[in-house]
Amino acid sequence: PVSEAMFMRDASMLTSVFMQVIIFATLFIFIYILIKRVIINNLQKINDTLRRITQGDLNVTVDVRSNSEFSSLSDDINSTVSTLKRYIAEAAARIDRELEYAKQIQLSALPTNFPEKENFEIYAQMIAAKEVGGDFYDFYKLSDSTVAFLAADVSGKGIPAAMFMMTAKTIIKDLAESGLPVNEVFTRANEKLCENNESGMFVTAWMGILDLTTGKMQFANAGHNPPLLKRANGEFEYLRTRAGFVLAGMEGVRYRVGELTLSPRDRLFLYTDGVTEATNTENKLYGEDRLLSFMNQNATIEATAFLPALKANIDEFVGEAPQFDDITMLM
């Protein structure tokens, strides 16, 4: 009887312990499911939304409202993203204003009164890209019988390029008006532009000085695209000569002078790489061959009509692709 009583007591205790374990296990599972549903799942939703936000989707919102804490967290995240979107929009608007300012710097520096004389005619066009570069052209009389002209392209984009363009244009003009030969203009301009050029910007340029009475022209090339020359009874051909180094690229560079004589009805075309490097949606370049072909197919058109026609041809080739570089042309 005693052993039987002890057995019954032990069995009762084991049953009680077993039931307690089952109850606690059931309670634990219930609490886990509740926590997962209320907290973990909601945190997962928030993390998924934050992942999309960090990937750049700022239009998505957090909308977890299971309790006041999650509602407050959702509102805080949405408010932060909204503020970020506003800052981004303001920064984009500021950049657009700066780009427009840079364009105005470019355009205001370019001559727009194109002379028409009995033995000389010049016309130029510069079409700025959205991402402003530093293209420029210039022409001016050095004497009653001498005129200087050039096309140039500054490296870089935005306001720094536009400001460097203004500096280069002013230096070159001042040196040319002092009576220096064209190669010496480039040699001294290079030295001046190298001074305090911590940004490492540089300029490609092609410049000619023409004597209107004799037709003799001296020219220099600082790493620029070769111009095209058409004799009165011939076709356009590239005027390929040995180009010097870019301006502001390195101190101590000296530039060669080239010479040729222009006759009545000869034509000379200067341009920047925005023409030949215009790219279409298939990532193909407009290129030198296509430019030469267009030039010869339209060789008799007056300059004032020719340059817009060439730009239209470039636009047709490019199609829907954006214009990434300035396009500058002078004839």
Where are each of the predicted segments found?
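Interdomain signal-transducing alpha-helical coiled-coil linkers
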Residues: 2, 70, 77, 82-95, ...
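HAMP-domain connector/hinge
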Residues: 55, 59-70, 127-128, 140-141
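Membrane-proximal alpha-helical signal-transduction linkers
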Residues: 38-61, 74-81
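Cytoplasm-proximal transmembrane signaling helix
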Residues: 2-46
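PAS/PAC or PAS-like capping segment
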Residues: 2-3, 154-155, 274-275
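Active-site-proximal, acidic helix/loop segment immediately C-terminal to a metal-coordinating Asp/Glu
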Residues: 159-178, 262, 266-321
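The cytosolic transmitter module of two-component sensor histidine kinases
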Residues: 39, 66-73, 95, 118, ...
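… and, occasionally, acidic/histidine-rich disordered N-termini of signaling adaptors
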Residues: 86-269, 321-330
